[in-house]
Amino acid sequence: MADDEVVDPKKYLEESCKPKCVKPLLEYQACVKRIQGDDSGHKHCTGQYFDYWQCIDKCVAPKLFAKLK
């Protein structure tokens, strides 16, 4: 029955798109490193996190929808 399982192509496509989104990832990692010592909780890297995933999503979307048609 394991051979009949449907594999989600999104995870594979996300992995294949990660090399194209290195710049936003590095910006996110730099932000995380910068705010590690912040005990106030006011600093965050939400913008950089979303920029990274927006890059991944923009790369994945056309490939994913082509597979779903």
From Swiss-Prot:
The keyword Disulfide bond applies. Disulfide bonds join C17-C59, C31-C45. Its main location: mitochondrion. GO terms for cellular component: mitochondrial inner membrane. Keywords: Disulfide bond, Electron transport, Membrane, Mitochondrion, Mitochondrion inner membrane, Respiratory chain, Transport. The keyword Mitochondrion applies. InterPro entries: Cyt_b-c1_6, Ubol_cytC_Rdtase_hinge_dom, Ubol_cytC_Rdtase_hinge_dom_sf. It is found in: Mitochondrion inner membrane. Transmembrane segments: none annotated. It is a peripheral membrane protein. GO terms for biological process: mitochondrial electron transport, ubiquinol to cytochrome c. Component of the ubiquinol-cytochrome c oxidoreductase, a multisubunit transmembrane complex that is part of the mitochondrial electron transport chain which drives oxidative phosphorylation. Belongs to the UQCRH/QCR6 family. Component of the ubiquinol-cytochrome c oxidoreductase (cytochrome b-c1 complex, complex III, CIII), a multisubunit enzyme composed of 10 subunits. The complex is composed of 3 respiratory subunits cytochrome b (MT-CYB), cytochrome c1 (CYC1-1 or CYC1-2) and Rieske protein (UCR1-1 or UCR1-2), 2 core protein subunits MPPalpha1 (or MPPalpha2) and MPPB, and 5 low-molecular weight protein subunits QCR7-1 (or QCR7-2), UCRQ-1 (or UCRQ-2), QCR9, UCRY and probably QCR6-1 (or QCR6-2). This is Cytochrome b-c1 complex subunit 6-1, mitochondrial. It comes from Arabidopsis thaliana.
